[in-house]
Amino acid sequence: MITKEATVIVPTTGNRGALLAYSVGSIQKQTLRNIEIFIIGDGVTDEARETIKKLGKEDSRIRFFDHPKHERRGEPYRHQALQEAKGRIICYLCDRDLMLPNHIETMSELLTDYNFASTTYIDVRADQSLNISQYIGYYGPASETKKGQFKAGISLSNTGHTLELYHHLPFGWRTTPKNYFTDIYMWSQFHSLPECNAYSHTEPTIMYFKRGHFPGASVAEREKDLARWAPEITSERNIELIKAEAFKGLLTERQQLRIYKRNVKKTNILIRGYQVSKVPAKILQMASILLKKL
């Protein structure tokens, strides 16, 4: 029975409890308050377990689903938890990311007219520089012509869908085969449904700390990054300044890319026998997918 506007799934594993004070804390500070928070434990340590239990005692909206370590990322545990969800919509947050205060409210509005939606995110780099990323330009019903956009990948934290649509999926969250990205594998199920009506929003509502930007970073180092940014997103003025800085980063990167492309076109480098300027889109797409795995 639907009694909440949103259920938020927060997967966590190992000894990452120190991050939850910040990631879950950003959920607790959402402008939309009628929510429930499901923390999905995938082999957490005793220390992390105590941290999660403490969070639950302080906020009755939090529920903890404690499981042993799964062979992948505990995907079936998410499915089990969603059988008990009471939210009209389902949102997600990686335990290393932060929600801007309006994220769930934004998703709630989008998922009134659509049943699958994504926002963009503010990409935080290792040097603390900012960018805006992951606008995939996907609108309307799922179709074969838009399949590539789904394959481009949407991160967990900036994706949401209705609970009703989830219950129409053939499988729901399930163990991801080796060499597949967990999120892309899951979102492809939504794409397979004729009733999937998706929307890509341009507004950044997540602060995203990509694992690849912080190679080998310890939990303590990640905690420092979250501690640095979490207080900054509690004021509207600061958030607007952060967005402006991220937009500047996006424009700067685009300009650098244009300069790079001009220089590359002047070289004699061949890619699979093609001049760089004439490389087929399929090869470039494959290269993009491989780079994302780094």
Which functions belong to the PLM regions below?
Residues 243-294:
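Boundary detector for helix-to-coil junctions that initiate low-complexity/charged tails
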Residues 1-255, 262:
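Nucleotide-sugar donor-binding/catalytic module of glycosyltransferases
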